[in-house]
Amino acid sequence: MERIPSAQPPPACLPKAPGLEHGDLPGMYPAHMYQVYKSRRGIKRSEDSKETYKLPHRLIEKKRRDRINECIAQLKDLLPEHLKLTTLGHLEKAVVLELTLKHVKALTNLIDQQQQKIIALQSGLQAGELSGRNVETGQEMFCSGFQTCAREVLQYLAKHENTRDLKSSQLVTHLHRVVSELLQGGTSRKPSDPAPKVMDFKEKPSSPAKGSEGPGKNCVPVIQRTFAHSSGEQSGSDTDTDSGYGGESEKGDLRSEQPCFKSDHGRRFTMGERIGAIKQESEEPPTKKNRMQLSDDEGHFTSSDLISSPFLGPHPHQPPFCLPFYLIPPSATAYLPMLEKCWYPTSVPVLYPGLNASAAALSSFMNPDKISAPLLMPQRLPSPLPAHPSVDSSVLLQALKPIPPLNLETKD
């Protein structure tokens, strides 16, 4: 039975056939040649596997080193200049990494500090909201402080209005003293102080009118009304109702208004001195002074008669001196046609309707030797009192002819 060749070598126990040669068994490979061929093939396979393993490993290592070098180059470019200047020469990879680590630590500390500040601010805002000190409370405190300061300033100026050498340093010192009193918790004002407060707030809106208007020098006695009204007197002069605050003088009778009218005459000079200290370019108009002097002799007409006249317009408290003096024509005789058409049928004199005198007294009053020029200005409409006799227009014409031009006196 023939032996089938296999891939394994023959066992050593079997003896080798002596007569077998290569030519004896055609188509059969000898065992020793098969073993040699097999060993060479295994060695070649192992070498190829090692080469194929080394090739991708080298590529991977090369790529990894390239990535590391690229990242280090980018870090070197991103480093601040002051860190680059700390080292001289070429920056090595290790130096670049150290500087990067130092810079990152500094940035981390800065971010931590900012976060702590933000947290502190947020906690402070929450505490402020809880305490109730919001924007509205601050506005109310500011308004109250401003009003207190303005009240103190006006009261101080009212007390020292007659003092001509008043300085701003004195006012500032007074305000500092009041502030110290308020901070200490003491009583700052007395109960009797609201009266000068009202007077000062009335003087405040009237002060710009006397300094801004050119022909408003005739309206200077508006301060006299506030001064007399704040002192508790109901003055009967025609300057009591300049802003509509003196309308109470209408309710008084004729007897109660005459002493106030006379007392106001004595106050005119002190107020004129005060106005002269403030406004130096123009003095008190002499027309007011003449009217006050005449009031002692002819104290029959009052401001209530002048105010109650409908000639003033719809507002009964409008000041009687608001009619500019320069609008009056040079001669009062120009009003004669109007007097004949409108006022002649009524039996009331034209000049001052409050004069309760007879026709003889009126003719004596119309005498140019006794009358003053400012009184001849046509002031008001007649009152409907039928007790006076009728006056002829010839008498009025005779009384009005010797009047000098009024515009020449008002220029003084």
UniProtKB/Swiss-Prot annotation:
The protein's matches in InterPro entries, at most eight in alphabetical order, are given as:
bHLH_dom, HES_HEY, HLH_DNA-bd_sf, Orange_dom
Task: Provide the protein's localization.
Answer: Cytoplasm; Nucleus
Crosslink site: Glycyl lysine isopeptide (Lys-Gly) (interchain with G-Cter in SUMO2): K167, K279, K288
Q: Where is this region: Essential for interaction with BMAL1, E-box binding and repressor activity against the CLOCK-BMAL1 heterodimer?
A: 1-139
Glycyl lysine isopeptide (Lys-Gly) (interchain with G-Cter in SUMO1) crosslink: positions? Answer: K279
What is one term from the GO cellular component aspect held by the record? Answer: cytoplasm
| First and last residue of the signal peptide | none
What Gene Ontology molecular function terms does this protein carry? bHLH transcription factor binding; DNA-binding transcription factor activity; DNA-binding transcription factor activity, RNA polymerase II-specific; DNA-binding transcription repressor activity, RNA polymerase II-specific; E-box binding; MRF binding; protein domain specific binding; protein heterodimerization activity
Where the record annotates domain bHLH, the positions are: 52-107
* BP GO annotations: circadian regulation of gene expression; circadian rhythm; entrainment of circadian clock by photoperiod; negative regulation of DNA-templated transcription; negative regulation of transcription by RNA polymerase II; regulation of circadian rhythm; regulation of DNA-templated transcription; regulation of neurogenesis
Compositionally biased intervals (Basic and acidic residues): 248-271
Q: What post-translational modification does the entry describe?
A: Ubiquitinated; which may lead to proteasomal degradation. Sumoylation inhibits its ubiquitination and promotes its negative regulation of the CLOCK-BMAL1 heterodimer transcriptional activator activity.
Q: Kindly state the subunit structure of this protein.
A: Homodimer. Heterodimer with BHLHE41/DEC2. Interacts with TCF3/E47. Interacts with ubiquitin-conjugating enzyme UBE2I/UBC9. Interacts with HDAC1, SUMO1, RXRA and BMAL1.
The protein's job, in short, is: Transcriptional repressor involved in the regulation of the circadian rhythm by negatively regulating the activity of the clock genes and clock-controlled genes. Acts as the negative limb of a novel autoregulatory feedback loop (DEC loop) which differs from the one formed by the PER and CRY transcriptional repressors (PER/CRY loop). Both these loops are interlocked as it represses the expression of PER1/2 and in turn is repressed by PER1/2 and CRY1/2.
Q: What is this protein called?
A: Class E basic helix-loop-helix protein 40
| Species in which this protein is naturally found | Homo sapiens (Human)
- Name the encoding gene, please: BHLHE40
